[in-house]
């Protein structure tokens, strides 16, 4: 990261602005209505920076390179006057900060501090297990008002014995069916990819979601707080859960080879999820509305209600009691508090070993299929609809307006071969989908991304974040059939990188496929 000019990059809550932490201060750029309007300030080298919508309030932490600065210090500043409102010091390095209209959340490796933003009164301190990435997410909707953070790892056989002796107390976790929860499990198997959902209105943990078997690398709430998306350290699977029930609504295969997921981002209308990764690809997953999935989710909820977990309910109750005991402001998240009740089999498909493909220059086109999907019987309709959610490769000479967009600049022999192979699998799945169990049809036809982007970076280890908006610039791409078609269907993808570049891509909301580069800007040049 020493070669890169940007030390930290972050969108504000409504993704209208981007804040850049620099070695010489920070910069805020409006990337929507008043595109190009920016504020630049000279300061210490910045480690973290967080905006509060488009207000003049920002929160930052320094890298600590300068004399007198420390990564344990948090500064709240007014950008209009470039003055420091207040400064706080913490016992260890600050790993993450989040701002809402009501709260300031500061994440350390083993603690989370929650402050009231108006008075800076400390409202709650949550003790957590080791969280070296400072991973957390906040819903900005004041009604849902949730905080998510990783739960401590726990042993699977210990959970089984605890559940068997806990009676039939009501469970607060609803992450799916438990028909394959413990089949074939080895003693001492540890699950690391669980999330705690914490209510910021009641200051109580309300749910533990079994998201992945591996450690979680990225997590994000939707704008209304009703959905949460996760990815593990392996980076091959992206999942979307309902925050009200904990039920897994969607599962997508990003690729087959491990990569680091840098960020997840929902569109404001909850129709898409974007994932950026160390392979410099951006994957766009479409959250389709088919009734077959709804039927599957209702069956899972019913199963959960019939087989509740007493351990989760008891742990949550204990945490609430500790939170309300004599005005205590500390909640300790233990392994029991993170107990997630019935566990989905879907969490185990992150662990299949795979080898890097030397021919693979475009990670979004990996061809290894997901052979560890849920064992639940998937309706035929879902298997057929999943074809529309995959980035199928149409013939270059095809004039089908519904076929995915193909970027000629990304064309390669390896890519064509992989896509032809995937098309054969999909055709086989369509022909035999009515006769094969869903587990086998999912091998032939996994649910993949709807569209993708390959960002051309000049350096290695370039981080990126991305967001999706309606088209706002009159930039015509020759890749589209007509101006009218472009205007009707075009969505705008903004990708910001730690090289200080803003890339603007066009996504055809009907066809998907490759997103076309419309323009690019340098955000750090004067």
UniProtKB/Swiss-Prot annotation:
It comes from Lodderomyces elongisporus (strain ATCC 11503 / CBS 2605 / JCM 1781 / NBRC 1676 / NRRL YB-4239) (Yeast). This is Autophagy-related protein 18. Residues 162-185, 321-397 are annotated as: Disordered. Component of the PI(3,5)P2 regulatory complex. The PI(3,5)P2 regulatory complex regulates both the synthesis and turnover of phosphatidylinositol 3,5-bisphosphate (PtdIns(3,5)P2). Necessary for proper vacuole morphology. Plays an important role in osmotically-induced vacuole fragmentation. Required for cytoplasm to vacuole transport (Cvt) vesicle formation, pexophagy and starvation-induced autophagy. Involved in correct ATG9 trafficking to the pre-autophagosomal structure. Might also be involved in premeiotic DNA replication. One of its GO terms (molecular function) is phosphatidylinositol-4-phosphate binding. Residues 385-397 have a biased composition (Polar residues). Residues 329-339 have a biased composition (Low complexity). Belongs to the WD repeat PROPPIN family. Residues 347-377 have a biased composition (Acidic residues).
